[in-house]
A protein has these predicted regions:
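Compositionally biased, intrinsically disordered low-complexity segments
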Residues: 34-37, 93, 155-156
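Mixed-charge, glycine-accented linear interaction segment located at domain edges/termini
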Residues: 119-157
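Short, cysteine-centered beta-strand-loop-beta hairpins and adjacent loop/turn segments enriched
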Residues: 75-81, 149-153
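Solvent-exposed edge beta-strands and adjacent loop segments
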Residues: 2-77, 121-137
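Membrane-topology and secretion signals of cell-surface/extracellular proteins
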Residues: 26-28, 113-120, 151
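Short, acidic/charged, Gly/Pro-enriched secondary-structure junctions
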Residues: 82-118
Length: 157
């Protein structure tokens, strides 16, 4: 009988943002109070069906887009009243254009799995959720990759 496997939890992901905006000397700050996070790689497929396929379709992958969809819960310091520094850095880029509208991020398995660690530059979308009187203040964030994501050594390894 083989060794049983252990399930990993969705909350294993950690997201850091570079507050120095520097590929050569980044200053990483954890983005805290993540309620949900989904890293994605979406292929762009082009139809390359031809007469030789006997009526069957065919596609070729021509492009990859990466993104991170996250729900952030607004939490503040009980001492200073300041919002999380990682969230603040991302929010500061959401209504800017060009270089000012992107952030340098890395995301990885907080338990140290070696094959789940990446970094890249991303454009920011920031959408407050609103809600009823009993709702938490949450924000839906989309980080859409600008260029390739790069595999990195997991900082938690």
């Amino acid at each position: 009988m083989s060794q049983p496997l252990t399930s990993e939890l969705a909350r294993r992901w950690r997201l850091d943002v570079d507050t120095a905006d520097s590929a050569s000397s980044p200053t990483w700050v954890q983005v805290r109070a993540i309620g949900e996070m989904t890293p994605k790689v979406t292929p762009k497929m082009q139809d390359d069906t031809d007469y030789d396929s006997d009526g069957y379709g065919s596609s070729t992958k021509t492009l990859l887009n990466w993104s991170i969809e996250a729900t952030l819960i607004t939490k503040t310091s009980p001492v200073t009243g300041a919002v999380d520094a990682g969230q603040a850095k991302i929010k500061a880029a959401h209504d800017k254009f060009g270089e000012e509208g992107q952030v340098h991020i890395r995301w990885y398995d907080r338990n140290g799995l070696p094959d789940d660690a990446y970094e890249g530059w991303a454009q920011v979308s920031w959408e407050p959720s609103g809600g009823k009187a009993d709702a938490l203040d949450e924000v839906k964030v989309s980080l859409d990759g600008n260029g390739a994501r790069t595999a990195i050594i997991n900082p938690a390894a």
